[in-house]
Regions:
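Core of compact, soluble alpha-helical bundle domains
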Residues: 1-135
C-alpha cells in the first residue's frame, strides 16, 4: 500500500482541509521553491526544469498526500528521483525548507510535525544513500 493510500485512510479531518486546501498549498509551494532555489546546495538539481510544471505536480502530490480531493497523477518518487545524486543531506535540507514555508504560512507546529512525519518515509525513495531522514 502506497503512502498516499495510507495517509488518506487515517485522515477524517484532513490536513489538506486544516491548512486551507488548494490555495494554501499554492502559497506554501511557491514559497518552498523560492527557498529551495535560493539554496546553493539544492538549486543545481533544478537546472533546466520547467518550474511551473514542477510546482503544479508538487501541489498535486501534497494535496493527495494530505487528504485532499485531487489525485496525484505523477510518476513514483523513486522513478522521478533515480540517478539524480540526491543524498539524505539534500532530502533533509528540502524538508527544512518545507518546514520553514509551512511555518511562514501560519500552519500550526503540530500540523507541520504531522506533514513532516508523513514525508519522512519518502527518503528511501528519493535519497540515493538510504540513510534516515532527520525531519
Amino acid at each position: 500500500m502506497g503512502i498516499l493510500t495510507l495517509l488518506r485512510k487515517h485522515k477524517t479531518d484532513s490536513i489538506y482541509d486544516r491548512i486551507g486546501g488548494h490555495r494554501a498549498l499554492e502559497v506554501v509551494v511557491e514559497d518552498f521553491y523560492c527557498r529551495v532555489l535560493d539554496d546553493d546546495h539544492l538549486s543545481g538539481f533544478f537546472a533546466g526544469t520547467n518550474m511551473n510544471r514542477l510546482k503544479g505536480k508538487q501541489i498535486e502530490f501534497f494535496a493527495a498526500a494530505l487528504g485532499g480531493p485531487e489525485p496525484y497523477t505523477g510518476a513514483a518518487m523513486k522513478h522521478v528521483h533515480r540517478g539524480r545524486g540526491i543524498t539524505i543531506h539534500h532530502f533533509n535540507l528540502v524538508a527544512g525548507h518545507l518546514k520553514d514555508s509551512l511555518t511562514a504560512a501560519g500552519v500550526p507546529e503540530t500540523t507541520i510535525a504531522e506533514i513532516l512525519g508523513a514525508i519522512a518515509p519518502l527518503a528511501a525513495d528519493i535519497a540515493s544513500d538510504h540513510a534516515t531522514a532527520q525531519v
